[in-house]
């Protein structure tokens, strides 16, 4: 079991200890780290909904470092990002591959960021099925439907023609930070946190 650092915050009410992720959640930062699967997706969705209830007008910052994973789990996060009222800014740290790349691109236009040494990878969904021969055709059709849906999502958020996205996701397609900007998956490569306007002007 991995160790989660704790931070201690001192207020006029005394000291209070938080795990690091809970403390960052107070700053409206949500981490999407590791394999995209049902449990992780439920936690991310719950955090997004909580932050919306806290302040529906203030941006949420989604930090992504993920190799991808379950399409259904990922689409639960995607749909929630589109559903809630706050804008969701996305930032790729490390990598955003497969479903992680879709979620990176799904951030608010103009607020999708990538660190300079991160990488992004897009491809078609992987299919694996074992069972009765009569069910293979059903699952093959479902994989094709999912693939078409994901390509439409990427086309919508990148501005690329659907036919181009279909071609570019035939095989694993790795992009550097700069290439991800050129493709339209993100809006900007950043190497330093930008200062708030008030500090920049002083």
Curated annotation (Swiss-Prot):
GO annotation terms (biological process): protein quality control for misfolded or incompletely synthesized proteins
Keyword Oxidoreductase found: no
Enzyme active site: 98 (nucleophile), 123
One cellular component (GO) term of this entry: endopeptidase Clp complex
Sorted UniProt keywords: Cytoplasm, Hydrolase, Protease, Serine protease
Stored SUPFAM superfamilies: ClpP/crotonase (SSF52096)
Top EC category: hydrolase
Domain of life: Bacteria
Transmembrane region(s): none
Reactions catalysed: Hydrolysis of proteins to small peptides in the presence of ATP and magnesium. alpha-casein is the usual test substrate. In the absence of ATP, only oligopeptides shorter than five residues are hydrolyzed (such as succinyl-Leu-Tyr-|-NHMec, and Leu-Tyr-Leu-|-Tyr-Trp, in which cleavage of the -Tyr-|-Leu- and -Tyr-|-Trp bonds also occurs)
Subcellular locations according to the entry: Cytoplasm
Listed GO MF terms: ATP-dependent peptidase activity; ATPase binding; serine-type endopeptidase activity
One Pfam match: CLP_protease
EC number per UniProt: 3.4.21.92
Complexes and interactors: Fourteen ClpP subunits assemble into 2 heptameric rings which stack back to back to give a disk-like structure with a central cavity, resembling the structure of eukaryotic proteasomes.
HAMAP family in UniProt: ClpP
Family: Belongs to the peptidase S14 family.
Free-text function comment from the UniProt entry: Cleaves peptides in various proteins in a process that requires ATP hydrolysis. Has a chymotrypsin-like activity. Plays a major role in the degradation of misfolded proteins.
Name of protein: ATP-dependent Clp protease proteolytic subunit
Gene source species: Magnetococcus marinus (strain ATCC BAA-1437 / JCM 17883 / MC-1)
């Amino acid at each position: 079991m991995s160790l989660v650092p704790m931070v201690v915050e001192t207020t006029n009410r005394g000291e209070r200890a938080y795990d690091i992720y809970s403390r960052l959640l107070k700053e409206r930062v949500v981490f999407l780290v590791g394999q995209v699967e049902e449990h992780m997706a439920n936690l991310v969705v719950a955090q997004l909904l909580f932050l919306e209830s806290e302040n529906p007008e203030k941006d949420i910052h989604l930090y992504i470092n993920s190799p991808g994973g379950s399409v259904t789990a990922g689409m639960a996060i995607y749909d929630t990002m589109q559903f809630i009222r706050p804008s969701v800014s996305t930032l790729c740290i490390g990598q955003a591959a497969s479903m992680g790349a879709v979620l990176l691109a799904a951030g608010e236009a103009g607020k999708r960021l990538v660190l300079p040494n991160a990488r992004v990878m897009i491809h078609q969904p992987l299919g694996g099925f074992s069972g009765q021969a009569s069910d293979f055709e059903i699952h093959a059709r479902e994989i094709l439907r999912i693939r078409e849906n994901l390509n439409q999502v990427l086309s919508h958020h990148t501005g690329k023609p659907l036919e181009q996205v279909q071609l570019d996701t035939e095989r694993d397609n790795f992009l550097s930070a700069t290439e991800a900007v050129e493709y339209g998956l993100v809006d900007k490569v950043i190497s330093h946190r930008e200062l708030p306007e008030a500090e920049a002007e002083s």
